[in-house]
Amino acid sequence: MIPKKIIIMAGGSGGHVFPGLTIARYLIEKGWLVNWIGTKNSIESRIIPTYGIKIHYISIKGLRNTSLKNLIISPIYILRAYYAVKKIIKTWSPDIVLGMGGYVSGPGGVASWNCNIPLLLHEQNKIAGITNKWLSRISTKNMQASPGVLRNAEVVGNPVCQSIIKVPNPINRFKNRTGLLRVLVIGGSQGSSILNRILPKVSFLLKEKIIFWHQTGNYELEKTKKKYNKLRLNQNLITSFIKNIASAYEWADLIICRSGALTVSEISIVGLGAIFIPYPHKDKQQHRNAEDLELIGAAKIIDQSNLNTKLIVNILNSLDRDKLFIMAKKAHSLGVRDAIFNIFNVINKISKKT
């Protein structure tokens, strides 16, 4: 039997890459051949090859920067990327092309449509990104994590890796847990400067109550470590990136983080109370992602413009492990744990028509 082939397009941020990687690994288990479209010097260039997945690099940039120079150069990058992906498609002849959103998906989505290859989209957020909005008009099938985001789309959830789904539930995690409150700090896959600046001060003021596991991102690891060391805060674990995120979720009583779609989905699946500081996009995409958890009392949302040391200290002082356990159980009630199966069923169904 000839194996089916798929090209997955995802890059720029962990929020696009990691869901795509989860899908890729599951498809490989099912006998599919997978190629990837991404960009160099990016999170996908560091991670995807380590899983034995062939990655093709294109030169493309996002359109959030609307400077005159960017507006002039962007069409050139898009056109070059379009022809590069079109060549890959014609050479490899995939059965399906899957776009995970973000600027990497744009040229390849149009190229797959032009080559009459079924184009599938997956939207992780509660507000669709500009690329998925455009491509949804020409795609074969749209998938979304939440209802009402893309037109004519099937709700499938956000795919997360099995290690996260297997994290013990809040009842088992919190049982017999004592000692300092364990707070996980994650500013997205590339870190957050504002969290790296504020959290060492918070740690100093609450060193008798809190221990942090802080992911700083690659660029600010040493600078953030110096802040903690200067305050003689040796009990905290400071790392640039947490590869085994499931172990970090299992360890934590609470998470302070951005509210990217994948992070919110993972927190719901694991069951973990959260303090969200949404990235301040104009469309408030991350704020929308976090609203359901705040509504049921599983999380608190702080706009970045209001964020300061005193506010975080006051919130943490108001919490104890019993309250965090209640927040964790509420978060757990919203977890969607069958997303990968839903997505595979859609992909498999479309592939049988090719």
UniProtKB/Swiss-Prot annotation:
GO terms for biological process: carbohydrate metabolic process; cell division; cell wall organization; lipid glycosylation; peptidoglycan biosynthetic process; regulation of cell shape. Keywords: Cell cycle, Cell division, Cell inner membrane, Cell membrane, Cell shape, Cell wall biogenesis/degradation, Glycosyltransferase, Membrane, Peptidoglycan synthesis, Transferase. The keyword Cytoplasm does not apply. It is found in: Cell inner membrane. Gene3D superfamilies: Glycogen Phosphorylase B (3.40.50.2000). It is an enzyme of class 2 (transferase). Its EC number is 2.4.1.227. It holds the Pfam family Glyco_tran_28_C. HAMAP family: MurG. Cell wall formation. Catalyzes the transfer of a GlcNAc subunit on undecaprenyl-pyrophosphoryl-MurNAc-pentapeptide (lipid intermediate I) to form undecaprenyl-pyrophosphoryl-MurNAc-(pentapeptide)GlcNAc (lipid intermediate II). NCBIfam families: murG. This is UDP-N-acetylglucosamine--N-acetylmuramyl-(pentapeptide) pyrophosphoryl-undecaprenol N-acetylglucosamine transferase. It comes from Buchnera aphidicola subsp. Acyrthosiphon pisum (strain 5A). The lineage of its organism: Bacteria, Pseudomonadati, Pseudomonadota, Gammaproteobacteria, Enterobacterales.
